[in-house]
């Protein structure tokens, strides 16, 4: 399952290297002020937003893609926060019940994976419920694709099948393991088998006892019990590893969903602060860098606006086709951002 809320065709890379001048760039733009307003003391929102801003996206299609998703977020802020809270719950629940999944023994790995997948099944059902209840109010390509995927892949039939298989893998009636004889008559190729369904009582009474080969280990035969335990572990080892990998896959999905939602949570926090100050916001129309299109009305310094108690005065510019701009610093005494620009076209 893919998230794709930052890019149309790939995940957001939280490990991507920052620009060589990231520190100086952050200081010049006073990003700490902006990031503080975005994060509201959420460390993940702070880190993801910092990387998203410093690793500047210049692809017009990617920018428009994110703008559509952000517009959905602004129309449905409570839904976005509900999604983010659900991802946080998933990560926290994973921490609490993952002690077995990292164990050395297949039986412990199997037990831990079953417990974790049962928890995740409930969380995935709740996630799909959010998509079903609110999908009609989201129109962006990113959220439309995400919600469609959740509704398609997490159907009631699928989740019921998962629950049934997890219940069966608890092996309450013991483990049926097959093996072949290898060199020295040692058991090899141990495989966990699904036992046949038991016949009804009347059938068993009519057929009578069935012949079988069996043996019983003495109560104090520790070596025999240990040998049986090892054979059982060899049989369930492939299944335990497969379940653990499935749990890891779901953890990765919730982790990436949390990471990419964190950026939009930061945008929501910032929008609330601007709205509280009565400051205008907009979605600019991006164009390719070589178009030299520079037109804006009421542009103001966001960080200055966040730090000043009073309002700030915006600036208007019509500078299409200009190549050079000289921008002065902020005039805080006059409570305004001074935007001085001169331009000349190179021959």
Predicted features, each with a name:
Residues 187-190, 304-307, 336:
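Short helix/loop capping segments that flank catalytic or ligand/cofactor-binding pockets
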Residues 1-178:
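Conserved amphipathic alpha-helical "coupling/scaffold" segments
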Residues 99-299:
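Conserved P-loop NTPase architecture
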Residues 2-14, 260-333:
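Conserved NTPase motor "head" modules and their coupling/switch loops across ABC/AAA+ ATPases, GTPases
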Residues 196-200, 313-317, 346:
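Short, low-complexity, polar/charged sequence segments that are solvent-exposed and flexible
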Residues 336-347:
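Phosphate-binding glycine-rich loops of NTP-binding sites
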Residues 176-178, 293, 324-326, 345-346:
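Structural motif
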Residues 201-206, 319-322, 342-344:
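Glycine-rich loops and low-complexity Gly/Arg-rich segments
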């Amino acid at each position: 399952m893919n998230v794709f809320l930052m890019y149309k065709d790939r995940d957001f890379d939280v490990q991507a290297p920052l620009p060589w001048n990231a520190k100086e760039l952050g200081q010049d733009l006073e990003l700490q002020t902006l990031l503080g307003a975005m994060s509201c003391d959420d460390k993940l929102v702070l880190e993801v937003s910092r990387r998203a801003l410093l690793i500047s996206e210049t692809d017009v299609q990617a920018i428009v893609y994110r703008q559509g998703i952000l517009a959905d977020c602004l129309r449905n802020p409570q839904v976005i926060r509900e999604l983010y809270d659900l991802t946080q719950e998933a990560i926290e629940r994973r921490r609490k019940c993952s002690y077995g999944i990292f164990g050395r023994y297949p039986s412990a790995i199997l037990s831990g994976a079953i417990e974790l997948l049962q928890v995740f099944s409930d969380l995935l059902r709740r996630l799909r419920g959010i998509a079903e209840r609110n999908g009609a109010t989201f129109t962006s390509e990113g959220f439309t694709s995400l919600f469609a995927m959740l509704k398609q892949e997490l159907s009631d039939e699928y989740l019921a099948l998962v629950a049934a298989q997890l219940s069966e893998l608890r092996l309450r009636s013991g483990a049926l393991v097959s093996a072949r004889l290898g060199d020295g008559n040692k058991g090899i190729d141990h495989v966990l088998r699904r036992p046949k369904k038991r016949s009804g009582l009347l059938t068993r009474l009519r057929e009578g006892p069935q012949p079988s080969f069996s043996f019983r280990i003495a109560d104090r035969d520790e070596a025999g019990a240990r040998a049986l335990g090892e054979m059982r572990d060899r049989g369930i080892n492939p299944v335990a590893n497969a379940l653990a990998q499935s749990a890891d896959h779901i953890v990765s999905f919730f982790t990436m969903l949390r990471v990419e939602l964190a950026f939009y949570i930061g945008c929501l926090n910032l929008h609330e602060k601007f709205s509280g100050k009565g400051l205008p916001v907009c979605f600019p129309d991006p164009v390719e860098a070589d178009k030299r299109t520079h037109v804006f009305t009421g542009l103001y310094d966001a960080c200055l606006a966040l730090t000043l108690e009073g309002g700030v005065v915006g600036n208007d510019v019509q500078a299409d086709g200009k190549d050079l701009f000289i921008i002065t610093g902020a005039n805080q005494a006059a409570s305004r951002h001074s935007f001085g620009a001169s331009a000349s076209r190179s021959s």
